[in-house]
Amino acid sequence: MDWVYAIVYGIVEGITEFLPISSTGHLILTGNLMGVPWSKEVKDAFEVVIQGGAILSVLVYYWRDFLKIRHLGHDRSQQTLWTGVLVATIPAVVLGLAFGDQIQAVLFKPSVVAWALIVGGVLMWLIESRRVQPQVHAIETIGVRRSLLIGVLQCLALVWPGFSRSASSILGGMALGLDRPTATKFSFYLGVPTLGGAALLNLVKERELIFGEIGLLNVVLGAGVSFVVAYLAIGWLLKFVSTNNFKGFAVYRVAVGVLILVLIATGVMSNGSLA
């Protein structure tokens, strides 16, 4: 059955990693509803692997854009863009290295994730209800100040598991004047160093568990499925935000958060620490 769990986890991760709906919340639901028999350590390690597959999909989807880094020395727009990405990554790196373990130990509970989904959904609805014209329409013109603020806001997902890194960076960008497509694309870019770095670090630390207990076949299967599904999700989301707002996602987040709370209240799901 492990290969079935690998495929399902890969699908869930691929769909939810870049949509503003919290991959954490959905992986919790998936594991509980399917009764996945893996230990907490195995689940954590496997989620890191399949997250790597999702991150790789961004590099492949935007491979032409990433190749422009070659012109960094003389292309001012590329200098501005990648300086912004670097600056926006710093807050999460500092916070994660300093307090990552403590945050997981104290806050990583299903009820905390559920409320993060609900509150994030409400904020998403409120931001989408503003009558404000966006000022930034290209990621090359975001600038260092806005990038840093988006990076700080992205940390909300780190200190409040379930809020969603994608949601915090996209909503933060929109609140700072980016239009939806630009905020969404910048969130994709920002995920590469933020999530990619975390995935590599955990892969090195947990390599024996990942390849020993999970098995190479399941690792390749889960990461491969995550890559393909995430690639499709990126294309779909970019097309969606060009003509639609995020209010539907806001309602969905609240519904999933309420569902988790109901499952906890009825004893179907334990509210014990996930760390």
Curated annotation (Swiss-Prot):
Cellular component terms (Gene Ontology): plasma membrane
What single Pfam family name could you report for this chain, choosing any that match? BacA
Task: Tell me yes or no: is rRNA processing among this UniProt entry's keywords.
Answer: no
Quick one: where is this thing mainly located? membrane
Query: Which terms in the Gene Ontology molecular function aspect does this entry carry?
Result: undecaprenyl-diphosphatase activity
Record membrane topology: Multi-pass membrane protein
Q: Which UniProt keywords apply?
A: Antibiotic resistance, Cell membrane, Cell shape, Cell wall biogenesis/degradation, Hydrolase, Membrane, Peptidoglycan synthesis, Transmembrane, Transmembrane helix
Q: Is the keyword Cell wall biogenesis/degradation in the record?
A: yes
Transmembrane regions: 1-21, 42-62, 80-100, 107-127, 147-167, 184-204, 214-234, 249-269
Reaction(s) catalysed (UniProt annotation): di-trans,octa-cis-undecaprenyl diphosphate + H2O = di-trans,octa-cis-undecaprenyl phosphate + phosphate + H(+)
GO biological process per UniProt:
cell wall organization; peptidoglycan biosynthetic process; regulation of cell shape; response to antibiotic
Where does the record place it?
Answer: Cell membrane
EC number annotated for this UniProt entry: 3.6.1.27
Q: Where is the signal peptide?
A: none
Protein purpose: Catalyzes the dephosphorylation of undecaprenyl diphosphate (UPP). Confers resistance to bacitracin.
Q: What else is known?
A: Bacitracin is thought to be involved in the inhibition of peptidoglycan synthesis by sequestering undecaprenyl diphosphate, thereby reducing the pool of lipid carrier available.
What family does the Swiss-Prot or TrEMBL record give for this protein? Belongs to the UppP family.
* NCBIfam families, per database record: PRK00281.1-2, PRK00281.1-4, undec_PP_bacA
Q: What is this protein called?
A: Undecaprenyl-diphosphatase
Native species = Deinococcus deserti (strain DSM 17065 / CIP 109153 / LMG 22923 / VCD115)
Q: Which gene encodes it?
A: uppP
